[in-house]
Amino acid sequence: MSTAVTITAPSVKHILLDSLVVMKIVKHVDSELHAGISEVSGDACAGVLTGLVFLEDSRLEITNCFPTVRNEPVIDDDANAAQQYEEQKQQEMLDMLRKFRTMNIDYEIVGFYQSHQFGAGFSHDLVESMFDYQAMGPENVVLIYDPIKTRQGQLSIRAWRLSTAALDLASKNDWRPELVKSAGLTYQNMFEELPIIIKSSYLNNVLMSELALSKSYSSDKYSTRHFDLGSKKSLEKSVRAMMANVDELNKSIQSLTKYTIDKQRHDNMVFSLTQKRQQENESRLARGDPPLPMDDIKRIKAPQLQTRNGLLDELLASFDTNALADFSKTVTSENITKLFIAEAVAEEKVVGTKDRTLSSVSSTR
C-alpha cells in the first residue's frame, strides 16, 4: 500500500443502485450465513461491483455484481498457496468480466461489496482493498451490507470511500500520530458516506402499486408480531463487540500517552543538547578551534509508537465502536417505543373491559 499514486478528488456525489444488485448481495450473504461458511472461513462475504460513472450528473450507477472466490484453508504447508489463491481469484474475475462483456452487461469495475454484522468490521485489510480500488479508479466505492438489520426487516446497505486525507496517508503507508494530526484526520472524517438510491424496474413499481391498492392483499396490519422484542441476541453481541473495542482503545490510549511523554522528553533532550553544542561551538570558534558536528545528536533514536500500524487501528476501532453504538441506540429506542405502545394498548384493553362490566351490571339492575 506504499505505492506512490496520484490522489484525484472524486466527483461522484450519489449512487444509483439497481435492485438486481441488492437481490444478489442479499442472496449471496444469506446463503453463506445459512450454510455457516463465513464462520468456518472467518472471511466476510465479498464480491465485485460493476457499472458506469456519469460525471455530468456526479452519479455512480451500479448495475451488476458477482461474488469473489473464497480463500480455501491450506491443508499442506504450501508456501505458494497465497500466491496461487490470488492468481485464481484474478483469473476468475477476468473470466466473469469477459462473460459480462460478451452478454453486453456493464463490465467496468466500480468497487466491491462486503458483509459485516451491525455495519462494523472495518479492518486494515479492508482499508488496503479500498485504497487499491480507489487508486484504480477514484470513483470506486465499497458497499457494506448488514445481514442482522436485514433479518430484522430493515435493509441496510451503505456506501463508503476513503477521504482524500486518508488516501494520502494510505499511499504513504504511514499512520504516525504527527502525520495523522497534521492531516486533521479522525474516525469521523476518515471515511465518506455516499447516499444510495435503489432503482427498481417500471414493472416492479407497477406491481407494488397494484398490491398496495388491492383489497384482497392482506397487509397483516393488526398482527402483534410488530411488538416482538426479538433483538436480545443481536444486542448482546453488539455490546460485547463494543466492549472488546473499548478495551483495545484503552490499551491504545495508554500506548499513545506513553509515546507522547517519551516524545516530549526526547524533544527536550535534543533541544538541550543542541543548545549546549551551539554554545560550545561558539566558544571553540572564538578560540580558533573547529566546531563539533551535530551528527551524534541527530543519531539519537526517537521513540516509536508501540503499534503495528500507527494510529490506523485506533481510528478503525473508534469507527467500529461508533457503528456498534448507533446500532445499540437504534435497537433500544425501538424496543422502548414498542414497550410504551404495548403498555398503552394493554391499559386500553383493561379500561374497555371495566366499562363493559359496569354497563352489564347496570342493565341487569
Curated annotation (Swiss-Prot):
Q: Which InterPro entries match?
A: eIF3h, eIF3h_C, JAMM/MPN+_dom, JAMM_MPN+_peptidase_M67A, MPN
Q: Where is this region: Disordered?
A: 276-295
The main location class comes to cytoplasm
Which residue intervals are annotated with compositional bias (Basic and acidic residues) in the record?
277-287
- UniProt entry tagged with the keyword Aminoacyl-tRNA synthetase: no
One GO cellular component term noted in the UniProt record for this chain:
eukaryotic 43S preinitiation complex
Q: Which UniProt keywords apply?
A: Cytoplasm, Initiation factor, Protein biosynthesis
Task: Tell me which SMART domains the record gives.
Answer: JAB_MPN
Query: Where found in the cell?
Result: Cytoplasm
Task: Kindly list the biological process annotations in GO that this record carries.
Answer: formation of cytoplasmic translation initiation complex; translational initiation
Show the PROSITE patterns listed in the entry: MPN
- Listed GO molecular functions? metallopeptidase activity; translation initiation factor activity
Signal peptide residues on this chain, from the entry's feature table: none
The UniProt record lists the MPN domain at 15-166
Q: Record keywords: Protein biosynthesis included?
A: yes
Query: What this chain does, per the record?
Result: Component of the eukaryotic translation initiation factor 3 (eIF-3) complex, which is involved in protein synthesis of a specialized repertoire of mRNAs and, together with other initiation factors, stimulates binding of mRNA and methionyl-tRNAi to the 40S ribosome. The eIF-3 complex specifically targets and initiates translation of a subset of mRNAs involved in cell proliferation.
HAMAP family, per database record: eIF3h (MF_03007)
Q: Which family does it belong to?
A: Belongs to the eIF-3 subunit H family.
Complexes and interactors: Component of the eukaryotic translation initiation factor 3 (eIF-3) complex.
Specify the protein name: Eukaryotic translation initiation factor 3 subunit H
Taxonomy of origin reads: Eukaryota, Metazoa, Ecdysozoa, Nematoda, Chromadorea
